[in-house]
């Protein structure tokens, strides 16, 4: 279970921070969402802990007018794709009723996250418990600065 541990932990931290900095109470959030899965998917889209992956091109390909040669190392910017305004209406806003739920945080194809179902379950249970209480930030947290994994050094909250 270690492979997905950091991603799930940082999704919880990023998601809790996003919930606490919204201009809505937890009660308002609960009243406008029918399914905790909508909360999970929108929070991981909004602030994905895994911002990018490196891959190697398996064949020559042209993307957006750029030629990429077979064997070239490429960076897949998942966090950027999740904020693409050509795909998501108002991508920099949290919308738990978002019609398009197909984001890139879980990867795709042969690289789709094998632990997705477990992570969704863990995140759903956790956010259900979080939304059942009232929390507030004690102080604004600082990011870890880790390359590739987006999260906080610590997230101090009170209930």
Each model region followed by its residue ranges:
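Cytochrome P450
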Residues: 1-159
């Amino acid at each position: 279970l270690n492979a997905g541990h950091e991603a799930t932990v940082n999704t919880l931290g990023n998601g809790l921070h996003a919930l606490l900095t919204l201009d809505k109470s937890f009660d308002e959030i609960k009243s406008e969402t029918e399914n905790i899965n909508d909360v999970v998917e929108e929070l991981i889209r909004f602030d994905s802990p895994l911002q990018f992956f490196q891959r190697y091109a398996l064949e020559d390909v042209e993307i957006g007018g750029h030629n990429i040669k077979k064997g070239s190392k490429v960076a897949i910017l998942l966090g950027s794709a999740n904020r693409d305004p050509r795909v998501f209406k108002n991508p920099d806003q949290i919308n738990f009723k978002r019609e398009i739920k197909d984001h890139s945080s879980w990867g795709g194809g042969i690289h789709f996250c094998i632990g997705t179902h477990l992570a969704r379950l863990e995140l759903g249970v956790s956010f259900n418990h979080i939304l059942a209480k009232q929390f507030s930030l004690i102080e604004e947290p600082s990011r870890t600065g880790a390359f590739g994994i987006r999260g906080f050094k610590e997230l101090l909250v009170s209930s």
